């Protein structure tokens, strides 16, 4: 590759691409890579062989880069930082804007599912994306979505916890894909239609695995939940935020069934999730003329969204507009960064990228 210097009469320089990159060929007097430039230029066969080797190296490098982003790899798209700057418009300093797919790739969701405090948050976020935001993700973000979902399913199969939660997530995703895949030719999903059909078959396989799961009893024989005092059992049951969990717990033993029908337990559950105004609009009386809080709860759930509470959430710094997990350090110039942080619910996270 000739290069003309400042003097147009100079012969210029000769470069060749090697495994270590582009190198310049000089003569013997400069003690360089090749002894004689003129002798090198006369070796036409050597030039052809070197060009062939450089092309092979270039193709191999591109292939390795492509394999890293291939859908067959199960590793999440990796970014060194655990935070992302959220900008919604172009400025002189920054061009473009941050998208939902970019934030989904760069925030550490793959590791977050291993944390019990963040697990429910990530699952809820996956559910919201599956409902309405799947088409707004880029191709690599969609592959990342499926890879994280696979890790969630494998974790549930191993831990045998949150089975119903993941069943609902898979059913929501499958229903959305059925609607999107039917729109053939409208390019609503990134990638070949056959690839998405294969992913739908994978979802059905995961659902079958969850349906066939058998809960194994612990090997040790020690103190169980039913061995605790009744007041302590009731206190623990009051920590459950889902009425379906109370119903399932009541099916374990007759004594637990009596506790699960406690009116005060269901009253506190209704007051936790819903406002007084919402409760007054859905009053249900029992045969004895008393409020049936259990029936009221399930009716309220069908009419209003339940209160969401998570052990750990994503937070947005109002000073520097950086999005990160709570407790993650980010470069902030505020005097008190903690006072500038606002916790985001999964829906708030989705709304943050609606332009």
Curated annotation (Swiss-Prot):
Could you tell me the superkingdom of the organism this chain comes from? Eukaryota
Output the Pfam families linked to this UniProt entry: F-box-like (PF12937)
UniProt GO BP:
cellular response to dexamethasone stimulus; protein ubiquitination; response to denervation involved in regulation of muscle adaptation
Identify the metabolic or biological route this protein is part of: Protein modification; protein ubiquitination
| Main subcellular location | cytoplasm
Protein keywords:
Cytoplasm, Nucleus, Ubl conjugation pathway
Q: Where in the cell? A: Cytoplasm; Nucleus
Question: Where on this chain is Nuclear export signal (motif)?
Answer: 169-173
Q: Which residues are in the F-box domain?
A: 223-271
Gene3D superfamilies listed in its UniProt record: 1.20.1280.50
Q: Where is this motif: Nuclear localization signal?
A: 62-67
Residue interval(s) of motif Bipartite nuclear localization signal: 280-295
Task: Kindly indicate whether the keyword Cytoplasm belongs to this entry.
Answer: yes
Ion transport as a keyword of this entry, yes or no, is no
For this record, the Gene Ontology CC terms, alphabetical, are:
cytoplasm; cytosol; nucleoplasm; nucleus; SCF ubiquitin ligase complex; Z disc
Role this protein plays: Substrate recognition component of a SCF (SKP1-CUL1-F-box protein) E3 ubiquitin-protein ligase complex which mediates the ubiquitination and subsequent proteasomal degradation of target proteins. Probably recognizes and binds to phosphorylated target proteins during skeletal muscle atrophy. Recognizes TERF1.
Assembly with partners or alone: Part of the SCF (SKP1-CUL1-F-box) E3 ubiquitin-protein ligase complex SCF(FBXO32) formed of CUL1, SKP1, RBX1 and FBXO32.
Q: What name does UniProt use for this protein?
A: F-box only protein 32
**Species classification:** Eukaryota, Metazoa, Chordata, Craniata, Vertebrata
Q: State the encoding gene.
A: FBXO32
